[in-house]
A protein has these predicted regions:
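Active-site/ligand-binding-proximal alpha/beta "capping" segment
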Residues: 95-127, 135, 186-191
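Gly/Pro- and small hydrophobic-enriched strand-loop and loop-to-helix capping segments
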Residues: 63-65, 127-137
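A cross-family phosphate/adenosyl-ligand binding-site feature
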Residues: 2-101, 139-174, 178, 183-191
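Arginine/glycine-rich "motif VI" loop of SF2 helicases in the C-terminal RecA-like domain
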Residues: 58, 125-132, 158-159
Length: 191
């Protein structure tokens, strides 16, 4: 069930990518987060989709919490207008802090870091360490191959169908909201 005023972690690229639809989707997601009075939790950067997303939330009256490691802040990559900025020492601390602050996890298009961050949250769900929903915001089928990989894991019995259904793939904010509202954590499997 979607809580009122959730904190939603969004992982995304520090680049805007090569499709205008990626930035458009980041803007739409930011507007949706603000319109629902939710708070964005993200990597704290001003570049790429991260900056587009944070700006969209802020421009629509929303709250934004950034979590950035010192080495990135020192390179002047932190967004200057955030509601809160947490500075941590390492990427591992950043991921842990974002996890502690958030009630849902979403991945916009991004690179290996984006994929690694959302995948870790999915993995934690499967072992009972993350009771919150994880979803890919699948802009222009960006995550089509990822979806196929999870389906292949089911086919080859490395992932149960029940656990696969706990991994969201949404192409609109309406689909994303419906997934978050209906989410129930996976049952922890017994070995």
């Amino acid at each position: 069930m979607m809580e009122s005023f959730m904190k939603i972690a969004v992982y995304c690229g520090a680049s805007v990518g090569n499709e205008p639809s990626f930035a458009t989707a980041a803007q739409e997601l930011g507007q949706w987060i603000a319109s629902r009075k939710n708070t964005l939790v993200y990597g704290g950067g001003k570049a790429g989709l991260m900056g587009v997303l944070a700006d969209a939330v802020l421009e629509n009256g929303g709250q934004v919490i950034g979590v950035i490691p010192t080495f990135l802040k020192d390179r002047e990559l932190a967004h200057p207008g955030l509601t809160e900025l947490h500075v941590v020492e390492t990427m591992s601390e950043r991921k842990r802090k974002m996890f502690e602050l958030s009630q849902a996890f979403v991945a916009l298009p991004g690179g290996p870091g984006t994929l690694e961050e959302i995948t870790e949250m999915i993995s934690w769900s499967r072992i009972g360490q993350n009771p919150n929903p994880c979803a890919f915001y699948d802009v222009n089928n960006f995550y089509h191959a990822t979806r196929a990989l999870y389906d292949n894991m089911v086919e080859n019995e490395f992932l149960t169908q029940a656990d696969r259904e706990k991994i969201g793939f949404a192409q609109t904010t309406q689909e994303l909201e419906a997934f978050i509202q209906a989410y129930e954590p996976p049952v922890i499997r017994q070995y």
